[in-house]
């Protein structure tokens, strides 16, 4: 584990499942987040084995968003099994809280 926290980039997913007839309604949130994680990996070009932690903000931590979606999405994306994950919920401030937590 490194002694310094490095935030190398930030990404976000579409809003979510949305309306019942919406394009993403039948896509599991974990799968959406896995695609975001892989897009980040591809854009920055890093080895997921070097990731010390996966920190995500999620304002709706129930139902299919539960069970630590950050960790589950990292596993779904095929990232290293060694990186833990944490999901933070501050409702509208979840993303900002995740960035501040990761920087500590």
Q: What spans do the regions from the language model cover?
A:
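Conserved active-site "lid/cap" helical segment
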Residues: 1-77
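Conserved catalytic cysteine-centered active-site region
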Residues: 58-104
